[in-house]
Swiss-Prot record:
Residues 1-21, 213-274 are annotated as: Disordered. SMART domains: FH. PROSITE patterns: FORK_HEAD_1 (PS00657), FORK_HEAD_2 (PS00658), FORK_HEAD_3 (PS50039). Transcription factor. Essential for ventral specification of the early cephalic (head) ectoderm during gastrulation, playing a role in the 'non-neural' versus 'neural' cell fate choice. Binds to DNA via the target sequence 5'-[AG]TAAA[CT]A-3', with 5'-ATAAACA-3' being the preferred binding site. InterPro entries: Fork_head_dom, FOX_domain-containing, TF_fork_head_CS_1, TF_fork_head_CS_2, WH-like_DNA-bd_sf, WH_DNA-bd_sf. The gene is foxi1-b. This is Forkhead box protein I1-B. It holds the Pfam family Forkhead. GO terms for molecular function: DNA binding; DNA-binding transcription factor activity, RNA polymerase II-specific; RNA polymerase II cis-regulatory region sequence-specific DNA binding; sequence-specific DNA binding. Residues 252-274 have a biased composition (Polar residues). Induction: Induced by Bmp-signaling. Suppressed by Wnt-signaling. Residues 233-246 have a biased composition (Basic and acidic residues). Signal peptide: none annotated.
Length: 367
């Protein structure tokens, strides 16, 4: 038989040592102290006595306060863990409770009643506020009655409302001065003659009020909404000058001028003017005379005669036109680009060399 199922009278004394002993009514319940919420957790309570919404893996909602857990639940919201609205700690084990510290407006209404005043001061000295120096300056100026403060007054506001900056004044005070000088949102105002004191006043520019969202400084300004008059003027301008009927842009002069047609399209540039030297002109003239003498012979093919006639005619007209007016810019482009090539006897194709086998070289005997 299993020793666990044995009756109580048959169990050995050694097994009784490992069984939990029932607690007396006069004994205090087990209590554990946790650092995360600083509350007492009773270990011997029956599960039915707990609220249905209590669970270890329950849904956690982070506090809105930027100071970490400072906006978390305190001892005053403990009725969620007890069936009655009575205080969380039972009356039988209650001790003289501490006085709850009033919530400070500078820390977003944090519930710090479960801590002593000395502990709160030490905690806030270690936690740095999640605000930039520009935001701290803007908060100080906006909370002033006349919306202006001196440099020493800004120091005083930051030190009084944020204990973190009390321990080291040299570092953050230099940062405050640099932000006042470099940020355009802060304007310097000279003191009046009747106002005794030292130092100028600093105020916040009215155009930069929208640059601070929830105490944080925005690097870029918010776009301003256009006025109704500006919208109407822009609409009329778009109606008068639609995008599809815009005037063509003016033509800028280029390094290579082009001739424009009446329709506005540019033509291709004219061919370059060929300048002939006297020696080259005499050479071409002698070649033309030789070919003219060759054409007087009888050719068996009419196609060769026609081709030779076209070559001589085109070459003669080109030489005469260039000699009369070498700087003319309006000569026919078809004559320049579509002229048939001219072949000498030394560079004729194979089928032309068979037709003139007995023609001697052009410069034979001169060298």
């Amino acid at each position: 038989m299993n020793p666990v199922q044995q009756p109580a009278q048959h169990r050995s004394p050694a097994s009784l040592l490992h069984l939990p002993h029932p607690k007396r009514a006069q004994e205090a319940p087990d209590m554990g102290l946790y650092c995360d919420n600083f509350m007492f957790s009773q270990q011997n309570l029956h599960p039915s006595q707990r609220a249905p919404n209590f669970s270890i893996g329950g849904e956690f909602t982070p506090p809105a306060n930027p100071y970490l857990w400072l906006g978390g639940p305190g001892m005053n919201n403990a009725p969620n863990y007890s069936p009655a609205p009575a205080p969380y700690i039972p009356s039988a084990f209650s001790a003289p409770q501490r006085h709850f510290m009033a919530n400070s407006a500078a820390f977003g209404g944090a519930d710090l009643g479960w801590m002593s005043a000395a502990s709160q001061e030490e905690l806030l000295k270690m936690v740095r506020p999640p605000y930039s120096y520009s935001a701290l300056i803007a908060m100080a100026i906006q909370n002033a009655s006349d919306k202006r403060l001196t440099l020493s007054q800004i120091y005083q506001y930051v030190a009084e409302n944020f204990p973190f900056y009390k321990k080291s004044k040299a570092g953050w005070q230099n940062s405050i001065r640099h932000n006042l000088s470099l940020n355009d949102c802060f304007k310097k105002m000279p003191r009046d003659e009747n106002d005794p004191g030292k130092g100028n006043y600093w105020t916040l520019d009215s155009n930069c009020e929208k640059m601070f969202d929830n105490g944080n400084f925005r690097r870029k300004r918010k776009p301003k909404s256009e006025s109704n008059n500006a919208k109407i003027a822009k609409r009329d301008e778009d109606h008068l000058n639609p995008k599809g009927k815009e005037s063509p842009p003016m033509i800028t002069p280029s390094s290579s001028p082009e001739v424009l047609s009446p329709t506005g399209h540019s033509k291709s540039p004219s061919p370059p003017t060929v300048t002939y030297t006297p020696c080259l002109t005499n050479f071409i003239g002698s070649m033309t005379a030789v070919d003219s003498a060759t054409m007087n012979r009888q050719s068996p093919l009419g196609l060769l005669n026609e081709l030779s006639q076209r070559n001589i005619t085109g070459l003669s007209s080109f030489i005469s036109g260039s000699a009369v007016d070498q700087s003319s810019e309006h000569q026919d482009n078809s004559l320049f680009y579509n002229r048939s090539p001219y072949y000498t006897n030394q560079k004729q194709p194979h089928f032309l060399q068979q037709l003139h086998p007995q023609q001697p070289p052009l410069y034979q005997g001169r060298y």
